[in-house]
From Swiss-Prot:
ATP-grasp domain residues: 146-352
Record's GO cellular component terms: cytosol
Superkingdom to which the source organism belongs: Bacteria
Residues that, per the record, bind Mg(2+) 2: E319, N321
Protein name: D-alanine--D-alanine ligase
HAMAP family in UniProt: Dala_Dala_lig
Chain sites annotated for binding Mg(2+) 1: D305, E319
Pfam families: Dala_Dala_lig_C (PF07478), Dala_Dala_lig_N (PF01820)
Gene3D superfamilies found in the cross-reference section: 3.40.50.20, ATP-grasp fold, A domain, ATP-grasp fold, B domain
Length: 363
């Protein structure tokens, strides 16, 4: 039987560049090499594409360990140095000429999870894992996601959306608006970033200007959101027209909230699979995850995160990730492992869904 050739796309022009490499390394290790041939395709911070020895060398790095011992800035320097020392030159990757059958997108954040790469692949007629252009673009924007979820009957946290340029030009009216609209603590978030990059939990009005300034440095669209009490619950969803939801998992942050440092550097958060909730509430969370998935028109995969209050039974959407992490601490593969789908089988299913006809999958 001939092998299916996969282009494993990782790196990218995103603040989540290093996390993408760690995810791709895990995915590469889980792919069934009896059935699939893997072609690593690395995208640099500047957007140059490499495939060959340099891409394979970067993919082999234990970047997770390196990040825990060093800073993200140092890992970025290391990656740039490896490319500079490589004899290879960047190129415009021709998927068809390379005999690629399907692309596994392991890019996180901007220029990978937001519909841009998906549109490029659609134009070339190359199948790929995960959501299509529209679902990817909507899910990347937290404000648009909230609108779609609310329209589908899923609760979201009260929030206001701000324009970064307008705020920086005249900040005081925004401070007054936030103070009159919300109590403290509250969250300030870039609208279109993942891995909790640029997010601040603000406990006092005096800390609001700095939190807004940080968010504005990452995005032109900012979300100010009320803090919601409850457990942080994550649900993995898999499939196209008939998606299935995993057993829900629970994250207990090791810091004030589940931020980038807690996720990838200090690794102090505790996880519980299944989540410590009554069965009836677990079922309701799974149903809500499917509702959000369908409302956004997702396909292939997503991880849907909620805040669940066990006392009053409220389920509030936090966010949806259309290319969830695949690192060794990531919940998406862990949740399906606990639901009876091992990592290698999960990768196989994702590649299968990627190659379904677009009209059948609703792309």
């Amino acid at each position: 039987m001939s092998k299916t050739t996969i282009a494993l796309l990782f790196g990218g022009k995103s603040t989540e560049h290093e996390i993408s490499i760690i995810s791709a390394r895990s995915i590469s290790g889980a792919i069934d090499r009896e059935r699939y041939r893997v072609v690593p395709v690395y995208i640099t911070h500047e957007g140059a594409w490499f495939s060959g020895d340099s891409a394979a060398e970067i993919l082999s790095l234990d970047l997770s360990s390196i990040m825990r011992k060093s800073s993200v800035g140092n890992t970025e320097t290391l990656l740039r140095e490896m490319i500079r020392n490589s004899a290879e030159k960047p190129f415009d990757f021709n998927f068809r000429a390379a005999g690629i059958d399907v692309v596994f997108i392991a890019l996180h954040g901007s220029y990978g999870e937001d519909g841009r790469v998906q549109g490029l692949l659609d134009t070339m007629g190359i199948p790929y894992t995960g959501c299509g252009v529209s679902a990817s673009a909507i899910a990347m924007d937290k404000a648009l996601t909230k609108l779609c979820a609310a329209d589908a009957g899923v609760a979201t946290a009260p929030s206001i959306t701000l324009d970064a340029d307008s705020y920086l030009a005249d900040p005081e009216p925004v401070h007054e608006l936030v103070d009159s609209t919300f109590g403290y603590p509250l969250f300030v978030k870039p609208a279109s970033l993942g891995s909790s990059v640029g997010i601040s939990k603000v406990h006092l009005p005096a800390a609001l200007p700095e939190a807004l300034k940080v968010a504005c440095s990452y995005d032109r669209k900012i979300l100010v959101e009320a803090a919601v009490s409850g457990k942080e619950i994550e649900v993995a969803v898999l499939g196209n027209d008939r998606p299935v939801a995993s057993v829900p998992g629970e994250v207990e942050p090791g810091s004030d909230f589940y931020d980038f440092q807690d996720k990838y550097i200090h690794n102090t958060a505790k996880t519980f699979i299944p989540a410590r909730l009554p069965d009836k509430l677990l079922d309701s969370v799974r149903c809500s995850a499917i509702t959000v998935y369908k409302a956004l028109g997702c396909r292939g995969m997503s991880r849907v995160d909620f805040f669940v209050n066990e006392e009053n039974g409220s389920i509030v959407l936090n966010e949806i990730n259309t290319i969830p992490g695949f690192t060794d601490i990531s919940m998406y593969p862990k949740l399906f492992e606990a639901s009876g789908i091992p990592f290698t089988a999960l990768i196989d299913k994702l590649l299968h869904y990627a190659q379904e006809k677009p009209e059948a999958a609703g792309r």
